UniProtKB/Swiss-Prot annotation:
Organism whose genome encodes this protein: Pseudomonas aeruginosa (strain ATCC 15692 / DSM 22644 / CIP 104116 / JCM 14847 / LMG 12228 / 1C / PRS 101 / PAO1)
Lineage: Bacteria, Pseudomonadati, Pseudomonadota, Gammaproteobacteria, Pseudomonadales
Protein name per UniProt: UPF0386 protein PA0712
Coiled-coil region: none
Family to which the UniProt record says this protein belongs: Belongs to the UPF0386 family.
């Protein structure tokens, strides 16, 4: 599956335990997203456009109104990266 660099960065942060928080307008449409890594830092590469592409590809999912997390398809699509912790 073709995954762009911003999508890959977002998936990598989610695979390590991050989540995508979202804000909805009065009609229920998602208007803003914020991607946090496991340490609580904000990832700037995660825009609304990147989020919608990940959601349309089925790489992230949300259950019962909770923040979006990586799905099994997302775990399979993410490429390994070195973690310099």
């Amino acid at each position: 599956m073709n995954v762009s660099k911003p999508e890959q960065r977002t998936l990598h942060a989610l695979a390590q335990g991050g989540h995508i928080a979202f804000l909805r307008d009065a009609s229920g449409k998602i208007t803003r997203v914020e991607c946090y890594n496991r340490d609580g830092h904000l990832l700037l590469d995660c825009t609304l456009a990147v989020f919608s592409r990940l959601k349309n590809k089925g790489l992230v999912h949300s259950r019962q109104g909770r923040p979006y997390r990586i799905s099994m398809a997302g775990l399979k699509a993410v490429r390994p990266q070195a973690d310099n912790r």
